[in-house]
């Protein structure tokens, strides 16, 4: 998959995605990543990329022309059509379902804003989607772009050594439940012992335990996902059993995610 990133700080993106799974994806040719700096397409001795906003107010706004020229160069580098996705807190929220849809694209262009944002006229005429990674504000779109790259590329065939890893991740199943707990050696530790069922060798019991734990975690931490999930009759029976053995009111449920913070 080819991903082009337009950013005033291209080194930021390179550093963020140059390690681990995504770094190996680049080495294997599964991710073709290209960084573009609008400043390289700005005019004048100072290569200015921003100016004061009309109407006054704090901060600066990114100029249309450097962005337009940069985007033209991006499109000229590869004739394959690609949506321009602007990382913005005003965009639609990135979730696993949307990541799967983006992963089906052969190519996409990510646009990172800075300062107070980008001239609205450029957004109106060129941007195909505004995408947010959460209801908070960052200094720029680079972190968001790195998140999108990671979320999308790990879904590409051959990126993960074990394809089942992606299928078992939180939000990845058809019902979008949270993942079950994972344990490794040693089996006994001062922090606690590995549940006996996982050491039993009984794969039917292990599968049931993992499903039950997935339901429990989702019910405690993200009850909204339980409401949206397409649970089977067996799942609902498991969930009813969980609710009987883990009675918690709303305040207690909320405290689970915070762990006392």
From Swiss-Prot:
GO BP term, example: tRNA N1-guanine methylation
Superkingdom as given in the UniProt entry: Bacteria
Major localization class: cytoplasm
Pfam families documented for this protein: tRNA_m1G_MT (PF01746)
Sorted UniProt keywords: Cytoplasm, Methyltransferase, S-adenosyl-L-methionine, Transferase, tRNA processing
Family per similarity comment: Belongs to the RNA methyltransferase TrmD family.
Oligomeric and partner information: Homodimer.
Function: Specifically methylates guanosine-37 in various tRNAs.
Protein name: tRNA (guanine-N(1)-)-methyltransferase
């Amino acid at each position: 998959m080819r991903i082009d990133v337009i950013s005033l700080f291209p080194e930021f993106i390179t550093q963020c995605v140059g390690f681990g799974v995504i770094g190996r994806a680049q080495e294997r040719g599964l991710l073709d990543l290209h960084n573009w700096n609008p400043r390289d397409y700005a005019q004048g001795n100072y290569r200015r990329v921003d100016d004061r906003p009309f109407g006054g107010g704090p901060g600066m706004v990114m100029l249309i022309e450097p962005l337009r020229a940069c985007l033209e160069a991006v499109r000229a580098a590869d004739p394959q059509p690609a949506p321009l996705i602007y990382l913005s807190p005003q965009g639609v929220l990135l979730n696993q379902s949307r990541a799967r849809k983006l992963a089906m694209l052969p190519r996409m262009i990510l646009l990172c804003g800075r300062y107070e944002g980008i001239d609205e006229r450029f957004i109106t005429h060129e941007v195909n989607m505004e995408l947010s990674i959460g209801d908070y504000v960052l200094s720029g779109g680079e972190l968001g772009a790195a998140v999108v790259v990671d979320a999308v590329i790990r879904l590409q065939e051959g990126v993960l050594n074990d394809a089942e890893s992606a299928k078992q991740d939180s939000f990845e199943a058809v019902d979008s439940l949270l993942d079950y707990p994972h344990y490794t050696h040693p089996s006994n530790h001062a922090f606690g012992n590995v549940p006996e069922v996982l050491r039993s060798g009984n794969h039917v019991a292990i599968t049931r335990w993992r499903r039950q734990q997935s339901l429990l975690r989702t019910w405690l931490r993200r009850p909204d996902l339980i409401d949206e999930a397409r649970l089977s009759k067996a799942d609902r029976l498991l969930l009813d059993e969980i609710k009987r053995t883990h009675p918690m009111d709303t305040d207690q449920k909320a405290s689970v995610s915070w762990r006392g913070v």
